[in-house]
Design a protein with these regions (language model features):
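Catalytic histidine-centered segment of alpha/beta-hydrolase-like enzymes
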Residues: 296-307
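A glycine/proline-hinged amphipathic helix-loop "lid/cap" segment
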Residues: 2-86, 306
Length: 324
């Protein structure tokens, strides 16, 4: 591992050494009360997911294009949005996948984040669209992410990107997609991502099967939502055990993967699976930077707040090291 790479993994990644877990979350941080009140009771099921998709077409986070340019690539498959900073300071790039439980969401949802990364890092940020379940179950999203990776490689010279300096990341389901894409690229050989940025990633279908997670309140993404999303993504399959690259936590051998930044809030439904995955990466010899935010709910960084600012700053620092 190159000198200077952040290699911090907290003892909190061991569920047995920490008082809080997905089944026993701490109080929500006071700074997140407004966000929790606004979106905490989000319901995602077979009736609402279509409405969420429709709303996503018309209600988007405010995107300020100052300091960046936006280009869409429709050359093949799903569209890819490329956000390039006016001032380039590196020849790497960040591929960033949106969230939405694999059943809703659009690249435009993360444009504000992508623009922030582009300006902070001085490199292009690529936001690929991917097909959504249940209409397009696994492996559709993975295949779209895989195609996006190769489309970026094909355009790397024209975009001023060094193929050896591309970080793959994502939020929630997009983080799970990023982790699975990293697995697939590792197994296929060929050009590899420089690092992976896993932001409260959706990694383990077995979480949805845990009935002990039905009682605790998990803001924004509940296990009821999870219990709809995973079967939808898996195409009605009972679990992901026999589906390689569907649920990243199912992978037995994590050795040889690129350095990872992994972050989650301590009130997130995904806490146990994310904490365990980070610990397993470290045990497999992968350089891991793990951040667990006390009182953080799922997607707590979607609104401006002090916890989000600190959380995002760590992501920028990690990514900068690999794209500079």
């Amino acid at each position: 591992v190159a000198e200077g790479l952040p290699m911090t993994i907290s003892a909190q990644t061991d569920p047995h050494q920490h008082p809080h877990s997905s089944a026993n979350p701490p109080p929500i941080a006071p700074e997140l009360a407004a966000l929790d009140k606004k979106l905490g009771k989000l319901v995602v099921n077979r009736f609402t997911y279509r409405l969420l998709r429709l709303l996503g077409r018309f209600v988007r986070p405010p995107f300020d294009p100052a300091g960046v340019s936006l280009e869409y690539d429709h050359s093949g498959g799903e569209r890819i949005a490329i956000i390039t900073p006016e001032t380039r300071r590196g020849d790497g790039a960040l591929i960033l996948f949106h969230g939405g439980g694999f059943v809703f969401g659009r690249p435009e949802d993360i444009f504000p984040k992508a623009a922030m990364f582009a300006k902070a890092l001085g490199v292009p940020v690529i936001c690929p669209a991917y097909r959504l379940a249940p209409q397009a179950p696994f492996p559709a999203a993975l295949n779209d992410g895989h195609a996006a990776w190769h489309r970026v490689l094909a355009r790397a010279e024209a975009l001023g990107i060094d193929p050896a300096k591309i970080v793959i990341g994502g939020y929630s389901a997009g983080g799970g997609l990023a982790a699975n894409l990293v697995h697939r690229l590792h197994d296929e050989g060929g050009p590899q991502p420089a690092a992976q940025l896993l932001i409260y990633p959706m990694l383990d279908d077995r979480t949805a099967q845990r009935r002990d997670l039905d009682t605790p309140r998990h803001s924004i993404w509940s296990n009821a939502n999870n219990r709809f999303a995973w079967p939808a993504y898996l195409g009605g399959k009972r679990d992901a055990q026999a589906l390689p690259y569907a649920a990243a936590a199912r992978r037995a051998d994590l050795s040889g993967l690129p350095p990872a930044w992994v972050g989650v809030g301590s009130c997130d439904l995904f806490l146990d699976e994310v904490r365990d995955y980070a610990a397993r990466l470290a045990e497999a010899g992968v350089a891991v930077s793990y951040e667990e935010v006390a009182g953080g709910i799922h997607a707590f960084d979607m609104d401006a707040n002090p916890l989000a600012s600190a959380f995002t700053a760590l992501q920028v620092d990690f990514t900068r090291y690999h794209v500079a």
